[in-house]
UniProtKB/Swiss-Prot annotation:
NCBIfam families according to UniProt: rplX_A_E (TIGR01080)
CC per GO annotation: cytosolic large ribosomal subunit
SMART domains the record matches: KOW
Annotated protein name in UniProt: Large ribosomal subunit protein uL24
Function summary: One of two assembly initiator proteins, it binds directly to the 5'-end of the 23S rRNA, where it nucleates assembly of the 50S subunit. Located at the polypeptide exit tunnel on the outside of the subunit.
Keyword Ribonucleoprotein assigned: yes
Ribosomal protein keyword on record: yes
Family: Belongs to the universal ribosomal protein uL24 family.
Length: 118
């Protein structure tokens, strides 16, 4: 693997979608870390997250959309006001989030979380 920054950025940008899933991971809260024995997890729609960095730091909200192509996460309540006054969702990088509550409707996700803990 190359050490050159422009090649690193190109590889990240051109990654296929199954590889980009690793780019939308966020750290777990302390309670969830102890419960599942993991430090971070892939962000899914329905998870409750806290924004840790940026203008919206401290905001809590539910994940409304995850864009794998651009590796962006959209959080309920994190918006930017357009010039005409309309509120539009602001994309947040997953590294700037902390997952405080997981959406466990997916059985496969539950198995994956609990399987690493054994």
């Amino acid at each position: 693997m190359s050490e050159q920054p422009h090649k690193q950025r190109t590889r990240t940008k051109r990654a296929s979608l199954h590889e980009k899933q690793d780019q939308v991971r966020a750290t777990l809260s302390e309670e969830l870390r102890e419960e599942y024995g993991q430090r971070n997890v892939r962000v899914n729609v329905g998870d409750t997250v806290e924004v840790m960095r940026g203008d919206d730091a401290g905001e809590d909200g539910e994940v409304t959309d995850v864009d794998l192509r651009d590796a962006e996460v959209f959080v309920e309540g994190v918006t930017v006001e357009a010039a005409d006054g309309e509120e539009t969702p602001r994309p947040v990088e997953s590294s700037n989030l902390r997952v405080t509550d997981l959406d466990l409707d997916d059985d496969m996700r539950v198995e994956r979380l609990e399987g690493d803990n054994e």
